[in-house]
């Protein structure tokens, strides 16, 4: 059977906020649709309407334009993708780069689903998380698109062994715990979208490596303090509640605000702590993230 590219899979006429999903058609052709089916089922269970598109690649301008046209027509509110690498298109000529990008055209949050090339048992026994190949293909490169990295929702499990060719036959098996977490995140983003900016709360987290305050926000070749100030000013312009008194005027003023209390610098231990939380309260807040 021949299928179009993109192939719009398991679409239904149903109510609820619409969630775009992009996944590889090769998995469907290999009879590995369990993951997509369970993701769609879990989204529908909480009243959302999944719109799954199965593709061969994102490196094709016609495929990207088709996706944008279809998703805009459906008025999706968030996008989920399992595709690896980034979405930048190939050069259309020796001198020109095709600047069309479906994520920029859609202008929506894009959640990157992770699928581990290890089985669940190996994953649970390991302390390193994603292996180097998964890290490169599903986290490092996709982040150039501005995708929001999530957690593993499927693991590669051995389903049979072909003794004739001495080879294991593996399929991606969905992880219901991961899918439940992802579905709740999708729901939260959709709810957040409906709030006015003045009612939203945002945390900016920067690194605070031990030993020296000079390592706060450290990024080689990056001006982290200035970037934070630019972000805060953008938030203020977009209607987030930031008063002029709370807005640092310079990088120096921002860093002074950050180091006036305790940090990971041992010399700051005599400074006044910003606040205290009991372990129970901390775990309560952490589990709500």
Question: Model-found features: residue ranges?
Answer:
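An N-terminal assembly and electron-transfer interface module characteristic of large anaerobic redox
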Residues: 1-289
């Amino acid at each position: 059977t021949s299928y179009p590219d993109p192939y719009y899979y398991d679409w239904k006429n149903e109510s609820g906020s619409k969630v775009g999903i992009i996944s590889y058609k090769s998995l469907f052709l290999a009879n590995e649709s369990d993951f997509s089916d369970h993701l769609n089922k879990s989204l529908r269970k909480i009243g959302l309407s999944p719109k799954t598109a199965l593709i061969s690649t994102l490196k094709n301008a016609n495929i990207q334009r088709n996706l944008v046209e279809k998703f805009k027509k459906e008025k999706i509110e968030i996008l989920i993708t399992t595709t690896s690498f980034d979405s930048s298109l190939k050069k259309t000529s020796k001198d020109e780069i095709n600047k069309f990008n479906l994520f920029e055209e859609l202008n929506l949050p894009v959640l990157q689903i992770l699928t581990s090339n290890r089985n669940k048992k190996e994953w649970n026994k390991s302390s390193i998380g994603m292996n180097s190949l998964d890290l490169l293909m599903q986290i490092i490169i996709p982040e150039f698109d501005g995708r929001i990295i999530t957690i593993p929702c499927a693991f590669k499990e051995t389903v049979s062994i072909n003794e004739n060719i001495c080879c294991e036959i593996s399929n991606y098996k969905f992880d219901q715990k991961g899918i439940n977490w992802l579905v709740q995140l999708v729901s939260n983003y959709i709810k957040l979208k409906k709030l006015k900016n003045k009612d939203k709360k945002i945390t900016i987290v920067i690194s605070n490596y031990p030993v020296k305050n000079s390592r706060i926000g450290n990024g080689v070749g990056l001006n982290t303090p200035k970037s934070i100030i630019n972000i805060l000013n953008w938030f203020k312009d977009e209607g987030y509640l930031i008063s002029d008194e709370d807005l640092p005027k310079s990088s120096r003023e921002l860093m002074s605000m950050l180091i006036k209390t305790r940090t990971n610098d041992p010399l700051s231990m005599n400074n006044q702590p910003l606040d205290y939380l009991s372990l129970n309260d901390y775990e309560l807040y952490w589990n709500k993230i």
